[in-house]
A protein has these predicted regions:
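A residue-level marker of the well-folded mature domains of exported/periplasmic proteins
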Residues: 1-184
Length: 184
């Protein structure tokens, strides 16, 4: 059984001891305790985000890039930190403006708020924004299209959403990791 995200950790922790012959794979989170039938598929999102930061800084004409994260939590902070480090690696004087949408899972489901944060950043001179915010990110991408600026997507190639304004997408290839876990 594959369980994606931190919200699934508790239920897997309850079910794993009850069903010792069932294998569980947690994605993007470690279990609360060690169970022989539970493994985690973890990623180094900060590394891909570092490259996204380099890409953003390399096309920025204002030396201001932005980040919109969904829920303020360690996973999303790793995206933002890697992005900022990559941008500053390319241009030590670049300004990285970052916003988190909220502190609950609802922060991943608010495209209107994502768009508002993106417009605020664009109004401050940002010309590229990386959105690591779930569905909230679609508002960021739409705002970039509307303002004629660049956006960087996440988790899948999002170029088809707004061709011409999508600089790139930071993809972790969760599918490959899950396939490898399935074979174990």
């Amino acid at each position: 059984i594959f369980a994606t995200g931190f919200a699934q950790r508790t239920i897997v922790g309850k079910l794993a001891p009850e069903f010792p012959n069932v294998k569980f794979v947690l994605v993007n989170v470690k279990p609360d305790a060690d169970f022989p039938n539970v493994q985690s598929a973890m990623f180094r999102e900060e590394e891909g985000s570092f490259l996204a930061g380099i890409a953003a800084a390399s096309v920025s004409k204002t030396a201001k890039v932005g980040f919109v994260g969904g829920m303020d939590q360690p996973l999303i902070r790793r995206f933002g930190c890697g992005y900022a480090q990559g941008a500053k690696y390319f241009n030590a004087k670049i300004d990285v403006i970052a916003n988190m949408v909220g502190t609950t899972p609802a922060a991943f489901r608010d495209p209107t708020r994502g768009g508002e944060l993106a417009i605020s950043q664009f109004d401050r001179g940002v010309d590229v924004i990386f959105a690591a915010a779930g569905n909230t990110g679609t508002g960021v991408l739409q705002a970039a299209k509307d303002k004629g600026r660049f956006a960087i997507g996440v988790d899948s190639n999002q170029n088809h959403l707004h061709p011409g304004t999508m600089l790139t997408s930071m993809v972790k290839h969760v599918d490959t990791a899950l396939y490898e876990a399935f074979k174990m």
